[in-house]
Amino acid sequence: MAIPMSMAMATPTDSVSRVWSMSSLKSALPSTASLRLPSSSSRRPVTLRLPISSPSLPSFSGLSPVNPLLSIGLPDWQSFENGFKIVDGGGRIYAMRHGRRVPKLNRPPDQRKALLRGLTTQLLKHGRIKTTRARASAMRKFVDKMITLAKDGSLHKRRQALGYIYEKQIVHALFAEVPDRYGERNGGYTRIIRTLPRRGDNAPMAYIELV
């Protein structure tokens, strides 16, 4: 079978152009790479081999362990260079609230808040009330907070107290009397006195009063 002259002359030209293109590709690659070209009879793809080096990762300088012995024996790119730094300029470190139990008082959050606000208002109005021990213990910190706001006496603190206490007259009386009554006392403005259980459900009861 006779081969056309055009096909016979096209084969060397294509091979030359192919060799020229692969040579130009080899010259364009970095000097660190080794390129292996296949022979003219082989049709396997070109394999490119690059040197593999260990990753040069920067050392982590964030939340490092408090104990510097924990970083001994680690590679340079895994070791902690800086210790655990505590921010001095008013910074805070937050953690999870493990064990911080909130008294539920068998109420949803909105009803529980309203209950504590009402108990605080009644205690500041009458000076002494009788309730369950759980409620007395839960409302104690809110009563102390209102008295602390009244000791400050500023307009901002007064508005905060008006947003919590239900009766406006109690707030004005509180801000007028607290500085003279608790001016020298730092905390501990209430007292809880246990009493007999409630008749019917036997719930533990207590009196809570202002000191």
Swiss-Prot record:
GO terms for biological process: translation. InterPro entries: Ribosomal_bL17 (IPR000456), Ribosomal_bL17_sf (IPR036373). It is found in: Plastid, Chloroplast. Its main location: plastid. Coiled coil: none annotated. Residues 1-95 form a transit peptide. One of its GO terms (cellular component) is chloroplast stroma. The keyword Transit peptide applies. GO terms for molecular function: rRNA binding; structural constituent of ribosome. This protein binds directly to 23S ribosomal RNA. Part of the 50S ribosomal subunit. Belongs to the bacterial ribosomal protein bL17 family. This is Large ribosomal subunit protein bL17c. The gene is RPL17.
